Amino acid sequence: MTSEKGAPYSEAYVWIWLPGATQPVVAGLLSQQGGALAFNYGRSYLARPDAIAIYAPELPLRPGALALLPGLSMPSCIRDASPDAWGRRVLINRKLGMTGGDAPQLELDELTYLLDSGSDRIGALDFQQSATQYVPRHTQKPTLEELLTAAEKVERGMPLSPELDQALLHGTSLGGARPKVLLEDGERKFIAKFSASHDLYSVVKAEFIAMRLADEVGLDVAPVHLRKALGKDVLLIERFDRVWSDGHWHRRAMVSALTMFELDEMMAAYASYEKLAEIIRHRFVNPKATLRELFSRIVFNILCGNTDDHARNHAAFWDGHQ
């Protein structure tokens, strides 16, 4: 794929929000090397007294190009910040003007997904073409009705007006396969999940009920709200990777369980609860409480019939050390 100026992307500067910071700094460079993407930290970043590793088990804080883990084509902790199925579909629609039936056959390269998606992505990273100037890719604040209309058009493979196209940009960096966008309401930020056109029942309402039940039985889950837009259910999930403090937003770094497993999507079948429990015992700040939470979630998922409990759907905060 190509940049806005027509030339292929060959690199992306990785910007990071350090713990407690309200503005990002450049951490390093992600560059194309053959069929893979390699990362190296910048000298100025390594010289900072407050520098932290993006994720030390994979990208330790040291100079030079960092070798990829076996089987990976890019650092998994950076892939965590990239769009997933829905965000990629929106970007394909945006860049190529695909039709509905063409969507599964079309793909963009990873640098395009990183550099053309919205900046308010999960975790504490973003990606820019510049090493000196940070320009966030944000949008105006559309209504839920406008966002739902745009999402439905993408699902049907229909072209978007410039206004609707811009409205969906904000949610392109999100993971997951279902239609979703990002919303901000004062001192809270939300992920809004929409019904899909092929749903046989209100899946988002079922998810709302499941999350409320999880909260009732003592699991640590995000606050959720159910709203209506154009007569359809919309699930609002409060974001836990953003903290509003002293008039500013702070970002919390996160890594997925897939990254902790040192796997990618092609190898996700090798992930297991047993391996995750072992990682928790050795690396987490409070392993006993975390293991109890993990076991409780496993039991709850079985009881409520959740079959979407894959490794990308588990994540942990990263403070630069643990």
Question: What residue ranges belong to the model's regions?
Answer:
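Phosphate/dinucleotide-binding and metal-coordinating scaffold of catalytic cores
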Residues: 1-311, 315-322
